[in-house]
């Protein structure tokens, strides 16, 4: 059996809550890291609560401006937090990621009929150029009562992550 050896850089953001005054610094940092480690593999993830409607840009674009920022920074994957999930209507959330150039991973999220939305993947096996496989999993916090009022269903995150 051949041994694979590779350096993998994993960067993530979380809980930005649309504090976009920090975004130029974050974007610059991630861009510089990708350049610095161009010969290695790297992943950039947002692990939820990027969107917060308290920001006028986010409110005015219904979060689509946030998705554009993630696209521009070349994110690979994202998941949703409660700010994406329960502050946007069903229709707004269902269309939020239409222009995303990254994949949205959420293992415990469906519509009320149990269907996984077209923009969601419950998990992803990411393969690097040298063949190393990395499992990408994510779940959002179980605020079931609020999600169900908006036409979504959440499962208990722990069993979904263990599945």
Task: Annotate the PLM regions.
Residues 1-163:
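Acidic, metal/ion-coordinating pockets
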């Amino acid at each position: 059996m051949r041994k694979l050896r590779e350096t993998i850089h994993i960067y993530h953001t979380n809980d930005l809550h649309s504090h976009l005054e920090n975004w130029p610094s974050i974007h610059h940092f991630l861009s510089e890291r990708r350049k610095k480690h161009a010969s290695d593999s790297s992943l950039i993830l947002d692990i939820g609560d990027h969107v917060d409607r308290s920001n006028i840009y986010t409110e005015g674009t219904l979060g689509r401006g946030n998705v554009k920022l993630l696209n521009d920074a070349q994110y690979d994957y994202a998941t949703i937090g409660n700010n994406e999930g329960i502050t946007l209507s069903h229709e707004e959330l269902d269309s939020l990621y239409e222009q995303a150039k990254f994949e949205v991973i959420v293992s415990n999220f469906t519509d009320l009929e149990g269907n996984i939305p077209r923009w969601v993947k419950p998990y992803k096996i990411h393969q690097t150029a040298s063949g190393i496989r990395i499992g990408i999993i994510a779940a959002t916090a179980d605020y079931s009562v609020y999600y169900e009022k908006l036409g979504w269903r959440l499962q208990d995150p722990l069993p979904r992550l263990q599945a």
